A protein has these predicted regions:
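Short secondary-structure subsegments characteristic of cysteine-rich extracellular domains
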Residues: 13, 17, 435-438
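Electron-transfer interface patches adjacent to heme c in soluble/periplasmic c-type cytochromes
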Residues: 28-89, 99-412, 416-429, 435-568
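Bacterial N-terminal signal peptides that target proteins for export
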Residues: 2-10
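N-terminal cofactor/phosphate-binding cores enriched in small/glycine residues
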Residues: 92
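C-terminal motif of bacterial Sec signal peptides marking the signal peptidase cleavage site
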Residues: 19-22
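Short, conserved catalytic or interaction motifs in soluble domains
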Residues: 25
């Protein structure tokens, strides 16, 4: 197995462990690295854990490293292939480096963007961190969901059209950002009573506290024409990027079988994905690729079942959240993304803004200059900033692709090559008890433990389809997700109300890798107990009965469940 040795990271892990040793004896270990020596047990059957469960990513997708920095590790598949290893390291640079306006090789930032680097949203390669404001800096993995609510307080409704689905709060000079991030307000409020009636004190007297965000953006923050009206805002934090190549390798027939299994026992499923009358997948459950591509055998593929993101918007990793985000978060164009991620309302506002026009009229080298007249600059700005303009082929200015196909290929080797750290402390009887409780409470109905990957004949776009990517065929993996959407019915819930079950693998190492362990889609849960109790906020939650069972556990058993979650 792959094991990166880094003395500085090991020292940091040691210092963290020393600090954590001051915790009360009855607190569960929070490091995720465990209190029980497990080296002699790794790869062996222990208690109610099989030998395979030590390797959540299978033998091809698991790293033995469980120290700080392990989220960055490549899989054994990459380690064993010199060309993939080199591409992985080059792709890692694409993820970690800041993009700029015009400095090669990481150029092309803007004109409107969310962050200047991928790692800003994925600190330590993990989940974003909870924020009390909206800085566009490292650690803030929040994306804004700005939408027209169907009713007062509703989580549902169409996105506003004036800004992009992932609204941008930064812009390259001389432009203004579509949303002025300095005017965004995030207020964290405390739940005073559970809608379900569950007390906020466990039967043994221990209390818990739940918080949720209220986000406001004044109309003055929008640099668009027109400005939006009648809108609400929700937060969505980034998901960790580790192990996504393994998820991509799960056969779609297996995921369809999971839908059918849940439908057969009466689970309410999102009608956008499951046609109850036909007892089959809905038409909108299928993703039609935005660019031409083939599977790894060179066969064309027209559509695939959606499996990635909270909202289940993407199907293949190679046209998935990362492949798309490295474009639309930065607005760095490439051969398969020749358009800007913008809106007509922003383009119009910029073409009418006096400071923008004056700056461009004073700079004959600007691609928006035209003949230098006000009318010409206005015309150039509007047309070149519109989302429908092919940046490489248009009558106004032919830009060049800002990310090369080789860079994109390296990025996808890195993305598909990220490993999952091995499980820890499965020999600990508390962890074994935690698994027993997890299963008996019904948590595994949604957090399905085990899947088996298929042949892994992955899809990829034509611009990189002739180059090999890491493959994970026929691996027994343990992501702890059913990859189906469910409703938790929380206060100020996720936009759209439905949320794909988040994989639990490796999350116990979040504190060691990112410095935070916030959970749930908007980081509202500061620890595992809060995350579980949010599942029981409403009796309409599809996980209410599991959360209610957790509520009734003794303090010792609750701690065992937490230790289990941190071990897997």
């Amino acid at each position: 197995m792959n094991y990166r040795s880094n003395k500085s990271l090991l020292l940091l892990a040691g210092l963290m462990a020393m600090g954590l040793s001051a915790c009360k004896d009855n607190d569960p270990d929070v490091s995720g690295q465990g209190n029980v020596e497990d080296a002699d047990f790794v790869g062996k059957t222990v208690g109610n854990f099989s030998a395979d469960e030590w390797y959540p990513g299978g033998k091809l997708g698991t790293t033995d490293n469980v120290t700080a920095g392990c989220y960055e590790d490549e899989t054994p598949v990459v380690v064993d292939n010199e060309k993939l290893e080199l591409a992985f390291k080059l792709g890692e640079a694409v993820f970690e480096r800041n993009f700029t306006d015009n400095t090669a090789p990481f150029k092309g930032l803007g004109p409107a963007y969310l962050r200047s680097s991928c790692i800003d949203c994925h600190p330590g390669y993990g989940h974003g961190k909870r924020q009390t404001s909206y800085p566009s800096t490292y650690g803030n993995g929040y994306l804004l969901a700005i939408y027209h609510p169907k009713s007062e307080g509703s989580n549902d409704g169409a996105y506003i059209s004036e800004v992009t689905g992932m609204p941008q709060t930064l812009a390259s000079a001389p432009f203004l950002p579509p949303v002025d991030g300095s005017q965004i307000r995030i207020e964290w409020k405390h739940v005073t009573a559970m809608e379900s009636g569950l007390p906020m004190k466990f039967p043994d007297g221990e209390t818990y506290d739940l918080i949720y965000p209220e986000v406001t953006i004044p109309e003055s923050a929008f640099n668009t024409n027109p400005k939006p009206t009648n809108y609400a805002v929700r937060l969505e934090s980034t998901i960790g990027v580790i192990g996504t190549g393994l998820i991509d390798a799960i056969p779609q027939d297996s995921i369809i079988a999971q839908y059918k299994k849940e439908a057969a026992v009466g689970v309410e499923l999102n009608p956008s994905f499951w046609d109850k009358g036909a007892n089959d997948m809905a038409a909108s459950a299928w993703y039609k690729f935005t660019v031409p591509g083939t599977d790894s055998k060179g066969q064309p593929v027209e559509k695939m079942l959606k499996r990635f993101t909270y909202a289940l918007t993407r199907a293949s990793l190679q046209d998935g959240p990362g492949a798309n985000a490295v474009w639309n978060i930065t607005n760095v164009t490439r051969s398969d993304r020749p358009y800007l991620y913008t809106t007509n309302a922003w383009a119009k506002a910029m073409s009418e803004n006096e400071s923008v026009l004056k700056a461009i009229m004073a700079d004959p080298t600007s691609p928006y200059y035209g003949d230098g007249s006000r009318d010409s600059v206005q015309h150039m700005v509007y047309n070149l900033l519109r989302p429908g303009t092919n940046q490489f082929d248009n009558p106004w200015h032919k830009f060049q692709a800002e990310m090369s196909d080789d860079q994109f290929y390296n990025f996808m080797v890195w993305h598909r090559g990220l490993s999952i750290p091995r499980a820890r402390d499965l020999n600990d009887t508390d962890v074994q008890r935690g698994k027993e409780l997890f299963m008996s409470m019904g948590c595994a109905h949604c957090h399905r433990p085990q899947w088996t990957t298929g042949d892994d004949n992955y899809w990829s776009p034509n611009n990189i389809s002739l180059k090999p990517l890491p493959k994970y065929p026929h691996q027994k993996i343990y992501p702890y997700s059913d990859f189906v959407q469910h409703k938790l019915c929380m206060k100020n819930d996720i936009h759209g109300s439905w949320c794909r079950t988040t994989p639990l693998w490796g999350r116990g190492l979040s504190l060691a890798n990112t410095g935070a362990e916030d959970r749930l889609h908007d980081c509202r849960a500061r620890n595992e107990v809060e995350a579980i109790m949010w599942h029981g906020y409403s009796k309409n939650s599809q996980a209410y009965f599991a959360a209610a069972k957790f509520y009734k556990l003794s303090k010792k058993d609750r701690d065992c469940v937490v230790k289990f979650l941190r071990a897997i």
